[in-house]
Each structure stands twice: as structure tokens, then as C-alpha cells.
């Protein structure tokens, strides 16, 4: 059964504004999450007279997936962790741009999960019209410091 989200989006994502691109979680259960955003001129990637290009919706979908695992973490009294978008399959956009003022719904359905890796079928809706669809593969390591250290990168806290 889906329930309203008890947390603001800032609590669910390991991001900071202005890179938090979705506004809120509308609905979730163990199999899916639905988020919402309104396209605004002050958003990153907004182009005057055009809006936001459809390919930016990949980040909206990735953030919805991140909100899903962030919400899971908080409900289990765990820390929200950083994750990575590993790949995108079957990206299809029916429109090239999203205009200022449009309110969009982002849905991510869990397809597969095995430890630190998950696959989600995602879609962006304007009203009832599906405008973009893609399948995202994501990875959320248990120890981000070890992963980065293996690449010679130190994460500052």
C-alpha cells in the first residue's frame, strides 16, 4: 500500500541545492516511488525561450530512484548514502523540451535489486501523458570512502 512521504526531499537525497531537481515525493511503497517537480526558470539546465531539454529528465529519474533508497534508509534508521547512475537503456522522449510552469510526475518502478545494485523502469508524466521513458541501473556502495580511495580520490566531509 502506498503512503505519503514523511520527509522533505532534501532529507532523502545526498545532494545540495541547486542540484536537487525534484520537489517532493508524492507516493511510495516497496515496489515504486512517485515524485513531482515543477519546471522553473531558475532551475539548472533551463534555457530561456525553450525550457529544460528532455535529456535532463534522466537526472530527474535518477533523483527519484535516489529518493527511493534514501527513504528506505531513513525508515530503517540508516544514513542516506551516495549512489551512482551506471547506465540507461531504452531512453525514449516523445517531446524535446519541458516548458516553464509545467508540473511533472516522475515514477520509478523497482525491477531488480541485488545488494548494492538496482534497476528501475522510469517514466516522466505531464498530466496523464507519458513524455519520457527509460530504464536506469544504479549502484549504491556500502562504503563510498573505500570505492573512492581505490580510485585515488578522498571524499571530504
Give the predicted meaning of each segment.
Residues 6-16:
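Short aromatic-glycine motifs in intrinsically disordered, low-complexity regions
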Residues 17-53:
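Catalytic strand-loop segment that frames the active site of acyl-thioester-processing enzymes
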Residues 20-23, 86, 106-108, 134:
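Small-residue-enriched segments and motifs
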Residues 23-26, 94, 109-111, 125:
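Conserved positions in beta-strands of structured domains
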Residues 49-68, 82-86:
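Compact, glycine-rich, soluble single-domain proteins
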Residues 67, 99-105, 109-157:
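HotDog/MaoC-like acyl-thioester-processing domains
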Residues 68-105:
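Hydrophobic beta-strand-centered segment that forms part of the acyl-chain substrate-binding groove
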Amino acid at each position: 500500500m502506498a503512503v505519503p512521504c514523511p520527509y522533505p526531499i532534501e532529507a532523502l537525497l545526498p545532494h545540495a541545492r541547486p542540484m536537487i531537481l525534484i520537489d517532493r515525493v508524492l507516493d511510495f511503497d516497496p515496489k515504486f516511488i512517485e515524485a513531482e517537480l515543477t519546471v522553473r526558470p531558475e532551475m539548472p539546465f533551463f534555457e530561456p525561450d525553450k525550457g529544460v531539454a528532455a535529456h535532463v529528465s534522466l537526472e530527474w529519474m535518477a533523483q527519484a530512484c535516489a529518493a527511493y533508497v534514501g527513504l528506505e534508509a531513513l525508515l530503517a534508521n540508516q544514513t542516506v548514502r551516495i549512489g551512482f547512475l551506471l547506465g540507461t537503456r531504452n531512453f525514449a522522449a516523445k517531446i524535446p523540451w519541458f516548458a516553464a510552469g509545467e508540473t511533472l510526475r516522475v515514477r520509478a518502478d523497482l525491477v531488480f535489486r541485488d545488494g548494492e545494485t538496482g534497476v528501475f523502469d522510469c517514466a516522466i508524466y505531464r498530466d496523464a501523458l507519458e513524455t519520457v521513458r527509460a530504464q536506469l541501473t544504479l549502484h549504491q556502495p556500502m562504503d563510498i570512502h573505500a570505492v573512492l580511495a581505490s580510485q585515488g580520490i578522498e571524499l571530504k566531509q
